[in-house]
């Protein structure tokens, strides 16, 4: 299965080497190809019109979001094209660290009342995704090249970002709402970790449930992005499911490691050196 999947990826992604921005006619073909994405903005116009008629006040935000997405994807396309043609592993590391940094900042913003939340989220995401990626490379599921590692890492980082942010946010909320229970446990001699075990478990269950539910229903409700991309790229459905199974496995692994680690890193900030709840953390709105 691993050999056939690697061959499939190689066959589908070999077109990358055939794209050269310096080649004659490249920019004309690129601009012609962008006509379809531009035409697709018609559905955004429909959404903006509906927002206006319903007085939602989201017109400006919708237009800004789509313009930003258009610009970001256009830029990242050229950046990835450059990286994919490089042989140095340094480019892989640089791109990966950039994704982790942005993801850590975003997850930390969700849990902004957790002290050092951005750093905790970044470290958790880095650990969860790097361990998972190392296992995949060691098992020869993916070769260590930019065109394989960067897209796969992007999927893992994005998923781990969401799960980690939810875990940290829910943990702080639950500890704050059940402060009396936690303080009683501390008074009876429990350690901070023991006193918050129930809240930790609840936050992890809430954060990981969407990942688990997605794995349960994959292919039944909607075709996942990786599988859809492969099929649209010319692969057979049987070939596409091989990669999608790997994707679901790696998302589950990376998300679980990242979310669990984030609880170990953020809960000490909830307590003082005297093993009392830190009022400053839970007094924030």
Swiss-Prot record:
It is found in: Membrane. Expressed in roots. The chain crosses the membrane at residues 30-50, 64-84, 88-108, 119-139, 148-168, 203-225, 240-262. Disruption phenotype: No visible phenotype under normal growth condition, but strong inhibition of root elongation when grown in the presence of Al. It is a multi-pass membrane protein. Pfam families: UPF0014. Induction: By Al in roots. Positively regulated by ART1. Interacts with STAR2. This is UPF0014 membrane protein STAR2. It comes from Oryza sativa subsp. japonica (Rice). The gene is STAR2.
């Amino acid at each position: 299965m691993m050999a056939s999947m690697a061959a499939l990826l190689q066959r589908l992604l070999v077109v990358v080497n055939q794209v050269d921005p310096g080649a004659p006619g490249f920019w004309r073909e690129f601009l012609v190809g962008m006509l379809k994405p531009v035409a697709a903005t018609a559905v955004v116009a429909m959404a903006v019109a509906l927002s206006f008629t319903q007085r939602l006040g989201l017109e400006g935000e919708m237009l800004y979001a789509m313009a930003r997405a258009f610009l970001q994807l256009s830029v990242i396309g050229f950046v990835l094209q450059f990286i994919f043609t490089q042989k140095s592993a340094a480019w892989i590391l640089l791109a990966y660290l950039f994704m982790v940094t942005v993801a850590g900042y975003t997850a930390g913003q969700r849990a902004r009342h957790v002290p050092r939340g951005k750093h905790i989220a970044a470290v958790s995401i880095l650990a969860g995704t790097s361990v998972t990626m190392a296992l995949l490379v060691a098992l020869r599921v993916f070769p260590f090249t930019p065109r394989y590692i960067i897209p796969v890492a992007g999927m893992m980082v994005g998923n781990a970002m969401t799960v980690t942010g939810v875990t940290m946010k829910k943990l702080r909320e639950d500890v704050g709402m059940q402060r009396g229970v936690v303080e009683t446990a501390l008074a009876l001699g429990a350690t901070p970790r023991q006193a918050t075990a129930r809240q930790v478990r609840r936050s992890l269950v809430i954060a990981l449930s969407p990942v688990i539910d997605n794995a349960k229903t994959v292919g039944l409700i909607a075709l996942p992005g990786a599988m859809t991309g492969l099929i649209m790229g010319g692969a057979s459905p049987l070939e596409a499911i091989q990669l999608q199974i790997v994707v679901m496995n790696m998302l589950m692994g990376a998300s679980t490691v990242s979310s669990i680690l984030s609880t170990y890193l953020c809960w000490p900030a909830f307590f003082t050196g005297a093993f009392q709840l830190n009022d400053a953390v839970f007094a924030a709105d």
